[in-house]
Amino acid sequence: MSRIGKKPVVVPDGVDLKINGTVVTAKGKLGELTRQFHEAITFAQEGKEVNVAVSGTDKKSSSLWGLSRTLLDNMVVGVSQGFSKQLEIQGVGYRAAVKGRTLELSLGFSHPVNYELPNGLEATVEKNTLITVKGYDKEVLGQACAEIRSWRPPEPYKGKGVRYVGEFVLRKEGKKK
């Protein structure tokens, strides 16, 4: 039994959820998301709640149960409230700026790094070192933030680089003579 899969997904007002077999479409004020689920997963909508069930008893089916429920919940929350992540830049001369749909990063390279934001995402920069990325698709948001961070991940000696706000970076001691 999946503890997460047993919980029903509550659909708030303003979100239109359409279930067509294994294809689920959520439409809200922020956008529209469509996802194809595994054929072992079934959905039952009762009013403002959606219950996720699994048809098989094998290990793969039961492992997909909680995942499918969480993915459905992320779709509903995303189109109604949206998600956001914050990245901070640490280092002398490291800064960021938004120009249209492009995030321009100065990360110590001989050239600026230009990152084109995917559709459905928007970024704002505060104090030149704090980037806030917002969107309604949690997967696209996480992937975009991981790509931004991958240009200059935090290094363990001085801590310079791009990191998530609140991320702990293990610091190392320098070489001793």
Swiss-Prot record:
GO terms for molecular function: rRNA binding; structural constituent of ribosome. GO terms for cellular component: cytosolic large ribosomal subunit. Gene3D superfamilies: Ribosomal protein L6, alpha-beta domain. It comes from the Bacteria. Keywords: Ribonucleoprotein, Ribosomal protein, RNA-binding, rRNA-binding. Pfam families: Ribosomal_L6. GO terms for biological process: cytoplasmic translation. InterPro entries: Ribosomal_uL6-like, Ribosomal_uL6-like_a/b-dom_sf, Ribosomal_uL6_a/b-dom, Ribosomal_uL6_bac-type, Ribosomal_uL6_CS. Belongs to the universal ribosomal protein uL6 family. NCBIfam families: L6_bact. HAMAP family: Ribosomal_uL6_B (MF_01365_B). Part of the 50S ribosomal subunit. This protein binds to the 23S rRNA, and is important in its secondary structure. It is located near the subunit interface in the base of the L7/L12 stalk, and near the tRNA binding site of the peptidyltransferase center. This is Large ribosomal subunit protein uL6.
